[in-house]
Amino acid sequence: MLFRSFIAAAALGEGFAVGIANGVELRTLWESILNSVGDSFVARHDAPSIFAGHYDPSFSLGLCLKDLGLIGELSTGVGADLPLTRAATHAFEIAAERYGMEAAELHVVKHIEDEAGLSMRLAGDWTPPWEQ
């Protein structure tokens, strides 16, 4: 279910962008997600990396695209359209084109920030996951 985390990471960035663009404070958005059905490992693990602006370099866009490619190959046997997998693949391809294959996975969110002219920095003690 690795592809689920890719979809969730992109969706987290989109949700933050929609909220910020409509005047909702980022901390309020994040707390609302954590206290709703939107809560997930991705929300708790990835959001602080977005807030800190390092985008968690422990996993690259290139690795995301490799895994999404494998999922795409495996999905041919499903016999049904999988639009979320295609959408996630497209979002990560766009980010990789802009920032390079070695850029951190969460550059899929940075792309949204840059395109929309928004900042998802949030003051706080955001200890990187690899230092916890």
Where are these regions (language model features)?
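ATP-dependent carboxylate/acyl-activation modules
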Residues: 119-132
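Helical "substrate-binding/catalytic lid" subdomain
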Residues: 1-115
